[in-house]
Design a protein with these regions (language model features):
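Catalytic phosphate/metal-binding cores of nucleic-acid and nucleotide-processing enzymes, i.e., regions
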Residues: 1-99
Length: 99
């Protein structure tokens, strides 16, 4: 089933909030292509998330921005469904536990 970017982003915000964190919206008129959200979680954990409608991919400009952020040592995730939000949060929880 196709989910809108708005639905995926809302699920991400709620999942991050449940873990005591915030998913800050990034609005940059000076650097196009940055991910939609900067996620900050307890324990000094920070990563970027690009949300998309189901089946949609990052544009070339976005991919270049993601690579720039990764080259600086940040994790960048592109998710296009609420199921992938759940998968990402499970991965983050496992990393927090050192597994």
């Amino acid at each position: 089933m196709k989910e809108s970017e708005k639905v995926v982003e809302a699920k991400l915000r709620e999942a991050v909030k449940q873990r005591g964190g915030v998913a800050l919206k990034i609005l940059s008129q000076y650097h196009a292509g940055l991910p939609d959200r900067l996620v900050l979680l307890p324990g000094s954990r920070a990563f970027f998330v690009e949300t998309k409608s189901t089946g949609c991919k990052a544009r070339l400009l976005q991919k270049k921005a993601h690579e720039m952020l990764r080259s600086l040592g940040f994790s960048v995730y592109v998710i296009d469904s609420t199921e992938k939000v759940s998968d990402l949060m499970q991965l983050i929880d496992l990393e927090r536990l050192g597994l």
